[in-house]
């Protein structure tokens, strides 16, 4: 159920280059269930910046009533968010969207989780929930450079984890697809989140496998009303789906990347 609340900042810390881990407390956490969903955050009380920021849920803790989001400071909005201190409040709308289908990976199966950059965070809650369901999780995380790497140890707590960096400064030199090929990683289902070129490469490499992709798009409303985040459906010039409400997770081939 979608709700809105002024959630309280429990903690915030810099975990990698321009990358922050923000933990929020509030009643709205009890509505957060599905990995891959996101929240829409208003970073300031004023009208500037006007639009909310869509931020993926990284970790959901119902017992503590807290959720964690990880974001990269890129513009004015996220710069303001990075200034928030414990005790401050943030206007949050959510949870929004359709997340990763857990039922696609039954107990005893092998799930490959592939994340690129700021697309890594939503895979953490997914890894946690899949592991609880008896699924073997293997993670491949891609970053530009060593300074951008985060949550390597956290993912390793759930299973085999590999890191790739574009410049070779940490882990395997190259891209996530290079790791999958070099390690001959097998899977029953693949879940991924990251930049479109990465998602496209995965969809093309595994055309006949169950592959679920979480898209990252700029959004206006977050609830499907403004049509700012539409993507086309294959084989049609007029049909489309909304990333915010139909997604952000789609099965490979469901939308044009």
From Swiss-Prot:
FAD binds at residues 53-56, 70-72, 77-78. GO terms for biological process: 'de novo' UMP biosynthetic process. Binds 1 [2Fe-2S] cluster per subunit. CDD domains: DHOD_e_trans. Keywords: 2Fe-2S, Electron transport, FAD, Flavoprotein, Iron, Iron-sulfur, Metal-binding, Pyrimidine biosynthesis, Transport. [2Fe-2S] cluster binds at residues 221, 226, 229, 244. GO terms for molecular function: 2 iron, 2 sulfur cluster binding; electron transfer activity; flavin adenine dinucleotide binding; metal ion binding; oxidoreductase activity. Heterotetramer of 2 PyrK and 2 PyrD type B subunits. Responsible for channeling the electrons from the oxidation of dihydroorotate from the FMN redox center in the PyrD type B subunit to the ultimate electron acceptor NAD(+). NCBIfam families: PRK00054.1-2, PRK00054.1-4. This is Dihydroorotate dehydrogenase B (NAD(+)), electron transfer subunit.
């Amino acid at each position: 159920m979608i709700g809105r609340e002024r959630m309280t900042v429990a903690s915030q810390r810099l975990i990698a280059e321009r990358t922050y881990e923000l933990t929020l407390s509030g009643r709205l956490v009890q509505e957060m269930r599905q990995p891959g969903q996101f929240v829409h955050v208003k970073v300031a009380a004023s009208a500037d910046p006007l639009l909310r920021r869509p931020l993926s849920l990284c970790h959901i803790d119902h017992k503590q009533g807290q959720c964690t989001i990880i974001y990269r400071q890129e513009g004015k909005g996220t710069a303001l968010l990075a200034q928030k201190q414990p005790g401050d409040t943030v206007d949050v709308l959510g949870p929004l969207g359709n997340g990763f289908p857990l039922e696609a990976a039954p107990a005893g199966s092998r799930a490959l989780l592939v994340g690129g950059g700021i697309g890594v965070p939503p895979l953490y809650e997914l890894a946690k929930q899949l592991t609880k369901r008896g699924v073997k999780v293997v993670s491949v995380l891609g970053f530009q450079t060593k300074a951008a790497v985060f949550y390597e140890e956290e993912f390793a707590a759930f299973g085999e984890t590999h890191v790739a960096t574009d410049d070779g400064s940490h882990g395997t030199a190259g891209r996530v697809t290079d790791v999958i090929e070099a390690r001959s990683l097998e899977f029953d289902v693949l879940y991924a989140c990251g930049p479109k070129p990465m998602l496209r490469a995965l969809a093309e490499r595994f055309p006949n496998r169950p592959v679920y992709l979480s898209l990252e798009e700029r959004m206006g409303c977050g609830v499907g009303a403004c049509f700012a985040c539409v993507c086309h459906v294959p084989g049609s010039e007029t049909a489309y789906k909304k990333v915010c409400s139909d997604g952000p997770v789609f099965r490979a081939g469901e939308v044009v990347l």
